Design a protein with these regions (language model features):
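Sequence signature of WD/YWTD-type beta-propeller architectures
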Residues: 1-269
Length: 269
């Protein structure tokens, strides 16, 4: 019997789930009363609250730094009127927000490197969705992918040597991996369904991902080399945005299995 725990019960739309480095909190995007904003909740489901309650413009898709002291997030300053998004960095208490990637285009999906010295992000600055890497202060930007098709959903391996990501480059959405410099491309999934949103387990041996290969979106696991893909959640609901606990023993995700959109945690052997 697989242990499954429901963390939230408010049913509001949620996405972009991230487990904190100390394992005590979740950071996620929530749409509530018509506003898209970052929220936090304790890992036991208590104290759900807006992360930056005084920020009224849309902000979403946050990521904790490895030391838990800062958060990168996407900010739609002009609420879609200019067709651009910024990436900001803010202290974990919500103070001192700064722009690190100005809004040249759609700048999104920031992901800290395991050493906290650089981060990945997705941008359309060169015409389509590509993956870039920048230093922690937003400087020294390097383009890692160069493909006509869209590349997105980047995720670091725990040792910082490789990056898993989703790409349309083979015709349908599959999960690939590359080195931290964009080399040694490897196709990890090969299925006519949609595979995306990879999440590398802290031990480096397993990758969780979302797929609709059995009809609806569910959470799957595969070995880090792409072998042995298997369905973890086995539920007719829609499930996405997997994130690992720091010890790698649990996986959190967002599911509609109880009618709304809530956070669940499942134990993983």
């Amino acid at each position: 019997m697989t242990m499954l725990t429901r963390i939230t019960t408010d049913t509001s739309f949620k996405q972009h789930l991230r487990w904190s480095p100390d394992g005590k909190k979740f950071l996620f995007t929530r749409i509530h009363e018509g506003k898209m904003a970052l929220w936090t909740v304790n890992a036991d489901g208590s104290e759900m609250k807006r992360f930056m309650p005084n920020l009224d413009t849309p902000h979403f898709d946050g990521d904790w730094s490895p030391d838990g002291k800062t958060i990168l997030y996407v900010h739609d300053v002009l609420q879609g009127t200019d067709g651009k998004l910024h990436i900001h960095r803010v202290n974990a208490d919500g103070s001192d927000s700064k722009v690190v990637i100005p809004n040249k285009a759609f700048e999104e999906t920031p992901r800290w490197a395991p050493d906290g010295k650089t981060f990945l992000f997705v941008s359309t600055r060169d015409g389509n969705q590509e993956i870039y890497r920048a230093d922690a202060d937003g400087s020294n930007i390097k383009r890692l992918t160069n493909e006509i098709a869209a590349d997105n959903n980047p995720c670091w391996s725990p040792d910082g040597k490789r990056i898993a990501f989703a790409s349309h480059r083979s015709g349908n959405l599959e999960i690939w991996s590359m080195t931290a410099d964009g080399g040694d491309l490897k196709k990890l999934t090969d299925h006519p369904a949609i595979d995306f949103w990879p999440a590398w387990r802290p031990d480096g041996k397993t990758i969780a991902f979302t797929s609709n290969r059995e009809g609806n979106y569910e959470i799957y696991l595969m070995n880090a080399d792409g072998s042995n893909p298997r369905n973890l959640t086995h539920n007719p609901a829609q499930e996405n945005f997997a994130t690992w606990s720091p010890d790698g023993k649990k996986l959190a995700f967002i599911s509609t299995r109880d009618g709304g959109s809530d956070i669940y945690v499942i134990a993983v052997k």
